[in-house]
């Protein structure tokens, strides 16, 4: 379980997050949504251990987070892949740094590549892949170390609409298969409503938790309902419009 209590953080000397209290249970998919500058990425960087926080606590499985760790896998919007390595070696890179024996890490990489639908592309280089394929590699690399928690920072923001829909459904299937705790940062309202088991709305900076919404659309998808059916459901449309109105309210209030 991820537990965040009374978290305060600065960015560039200015308050970025204020009194953040969140819990992410095992097997849940928490989505954090908010306007630009609300501290979404700062929150993910704090949980990943990339930057320090000033007050409060962040705990994963009862242990305080003080820096990066293998129990947290991170997927970035720009992938962060190594262009001089092929797909297989990119996926295996973290395992190599951890000292995993070569044959074992290559076998794990092969299984992860297969899991994200890139079987047969193991020897391709990153520059030979589409944007969606590169994000699949990023997800496979993050999962290769078998982390407790998967963190994703707007991973589909640069993709076209069709590819983005494919990647959303892939991530939900992986979430169901692995049972991982997942925290997704996004600015896309429809994506947030579709994918979250709990949606957290942040106010403009300094970011505060404005509202927490339990949702069941992701569970409906992994239970077998199509994404098209879900997104055309009046309940889904009503929730999407409600969240949109809340985001616009905050923009108006702080403009």
Swiss-Prot record:
It is an enzyme of class 7 (translocase). This is Taurine import ATP-binding protein TauB. One of its GO terms (cellular component) is plasma membrane. It comes from Escherichia coli O6:K15:H31 (strain 536 / UPEC). Part of the ABC transporter complex TauABC involved in taurine import. Responsible for energy coupling to the transport system. SMART domains: AAA. It comes from the Bacteria. Belongs to the ABC transporter superfamily. Taurine importer (TC 3.A.1.17.1) family. Keywords: ATP-binding, Cell inner membrane, Cell membrane, Membrane, Nucleotide-binding, Translocase, Transport. It is a peripheral membrane protein. It catalyses: taurine(out) + ATP + H2O = taurine(in) + ADP + phosphate + H(+). Transmembrane segments: none annotated. It is found in: Cell inner membrane.
């Amino acid at each position: 379980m991820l537990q965040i209590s009374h978290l305060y953080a600065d960015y560039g000397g200015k308050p970025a997050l204020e009194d953040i209290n969140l819990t992410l249970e095992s097997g849940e998919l928490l989505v954090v949504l908010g306007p630009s500058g609300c501290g979404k990425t700062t929150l993910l960087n704090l949980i990943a251990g990339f930057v320090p926080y000033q007050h409060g606590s962040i705990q994963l499985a009862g242990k305080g987070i003080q820096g990066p760790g293998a129990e947290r896998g991170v997927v970035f919007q720009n992938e962060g892949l190594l262009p001089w390595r092929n797909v297989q070696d990119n996926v295996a890179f973290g395992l190599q740094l951890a000292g995993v024996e070569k044959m074992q890490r290559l076998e794990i990489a092969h299984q992860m590549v297969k899991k994200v639908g890139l079987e047969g592309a193991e020897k391709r280089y990153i520059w030979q892949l589409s944007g969606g394929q590169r994000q699949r590699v990023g997800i496979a690399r993050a999962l290769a170390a078998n982390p407790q928690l998967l963190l994703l920072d707007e991973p589909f923001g640069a993709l076209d609409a069709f590819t983005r829909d494919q990647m959303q459904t892939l991530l939900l299937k992986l979430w169901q298969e692995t049972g991982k705790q997942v925290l997704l940062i996004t600015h896309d309202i429809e994506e947030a409503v579709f994918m979250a088991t709990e949606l957290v709305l942040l106010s403009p900076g300094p970011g505060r938790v404005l509202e927490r919404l339990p949702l069941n659309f992701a569970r409906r998808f992994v239970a077998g309902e199509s994404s098209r059916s879900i997104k055309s459901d009046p309940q889904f449309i009503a929730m999407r419009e409600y969240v949109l109105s809340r985001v616009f309210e905050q923009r108006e209030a702080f403009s």
